[in-house]
Amino acid sequence: MEQKKLKQLLSEMSLREKIGQMIQLTGIYFDDDAVLTGEVGEDQPPQWVTQYAGSVLGMIGAEKLRGIQKKYVEAHPHHIPLLFMADVIHGCRTIAPIPLGQACSFHPELVRKMARHAAAESASEGIRATFSPMIDVSRDPRWGRIMESFGEDPFLNGVMGTAMLRGYQGEEGKDPAGNKKIPESGIAGCLKHFAGYGAVSAGREYNDVEISQRTFREQYLKPFRMAMHADPAMVMTAFNAVDRRPVSGNKELLEGTLREEMGFSGTVISDWGSIGQLEEQNVVSSQKEAAEAAVRAGVDIDMMSPAYMFHLEELVKEGSIPTSLIDKSAWNVLVMKNRLGLFENPFAGMQGEEPLSAEAKKTALALACESSVLLKNDDMLPLKPERKVFWGGPYVESRELLSRWAIFGRYDDVETIREVLKARKMPVRFLPECEILTEEERRLWQAENCRIQDSGEQDKEIPEICVNSGKQYATLDEIEPEDTVVLVLGEHEAQSGEAASRAFLDLPEGQQKFFDAVAGRTSHIVTVILSGRPLDIRKIAEKSQAVLFVWRPGTMGAEAVVRLVYGEETPSGKLSVSIPWCVGQVPVSYWDVKTGHRMVETNPENRFTSRYMDIPNEPLYPFGFGLSYTEFTITPPIFEKQEREDKIDISCKVKNVGEVPGAEVVQCYVETLCAPVVRPDRELIRFRKIFLLPGEEQKVKFTVNRKELAFYGENMELIDGDVQFRFIVGNSSRSEAGSILYAF
């Protein structure tokens, strides 16, 4: 629709119609089978709200949504279409690894490609907007939502978030009137959670955030600044407060920082109920005040709180807020719908890609392989196909390779590891399965409430893992000291995700006992770990000859595990988040700021240093770390001839000196050598994943904009000169191939 006609439409809409565009309801008000991802209050929306609500979340199914849309558009006075949204976090029907795992691929183009498949599958089922990507920097694995993040590094979050966003929104063009258009096979993306939510205190869900303005702006806002280049359709407000001011009522942050400073021009949507929760946070005394605070702050859509639906109309009529605020927010929603082409075709995209296409599964498999990180390998992997091996652990026969956020994924789309091994006729034997969780743990984690769709109309519970009397199992007593055992262990999917904070990061009790029993029979153990977060795996690593961390790998997870273990694929993942030595270290990250009383290698026993007395300072495995089945060398960096004063060109060479093809991630970090404020130890500023054949060498060139080196000074002024930096290249945050100094 032309801008002129869109403005005319807005001018003709009634107050209730405009407010309706600012209200998002859950699908349960339209269909009984809608997916709930939050709490529903006791107050039912007024009839006019369900008639005029601008968007709905948690519904899927082209035929169903087509019927709802048709009825809604016909009944609406101005025939404005609904916008169906959902949490498509790491795939719609074809499920990719969790975002934390995807970041370990260090392959943004593959992440973009997978997001395109997710968008096409979503659009074909009627979903035209997703609440993803989440680019909350997170250093605390106790926080369950770290699984949705791209990890602890601001730059990596920005790169991966931008790639995923571009995948969702597709190759945007323009209509004849010059309006930006998301293709029918695309969906509107949403950057979240703005901002600082990954820094919740103690890793506890929905908790407060206490960080300095300098850290907030330099680390936690950086991914959002970077992703603005991809023109996000939406930004979601965080539950938390920043500097004790809840985001959903923070005009300075939403209007000043997000819109004016960052240049965001899309739609701001609240998280589920966060506007109403302003009252719980005691910054307002009523839902009416909450509605006024949020609309003045610039929140365009109220997701599932009573504030807007019950109080905005009254606030306008009594003169407490001007109609211009309503017009502004309603306009932002209409522009987003126009960008999606819904005015021309309210059913746009509903006849698109079939789910689980060969290409989608191929991409999901590639991403599952590249997301997996080989943490330890004492000449154990890869296994030879003809080698007799025992396989055990609850995930050998489980289809639970998805996650709590794979809300439209189906277990019957997932092969088990046992099925993959059997299909290849490998000489393997299977050990009796232990449960993923004990009964007590299942009650604690409410695992019985963790549900996912099957191929029918109804949901089904996560299947129990139990010994099938029709299958042949070996006993632990049959394991000899020289035998090799592959154990596939990990968290239950209910143990990570939203509302899944953990104080302890150990494996479930029964699995740890199972591991110890096997370790009592043989030392030749390969441990494959599935998880939505870093775990405390120190005891596992000590008794394993190889450790492969595969996160929650998705639909093609079983195939990926088998390929990696037997060397059909070479591991190339690098950690997007540090694996702590133990939970006492967290929050932990490689970019911690420098301190006095630094611990030095030449005097490790010095008590009066910044150290733990009972554990190392360093994590068990640092950010950027990951092994391969081949070896690489990286030369020290050099400066290229400077073509422009505002750019710095740094290059090095990487060579595969091993015997098999593989990929290395060359990482470039920058260290500020002297500044008026304390700076991070180092910061990732560029990376490049290079695939090389044995003996092959390739030059890697990094171009860095000088403005990227700027930081905030004593009075929060930007410092962009008279500073010396050290650029470091290597293959992890703690591995240096060389460095070079630069001053500007």
Residue ranges and their predicted role:
Residues 1-714, 719-735, 744:
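Glycoside hydrolase catalytic-domain context in secreted enzymes
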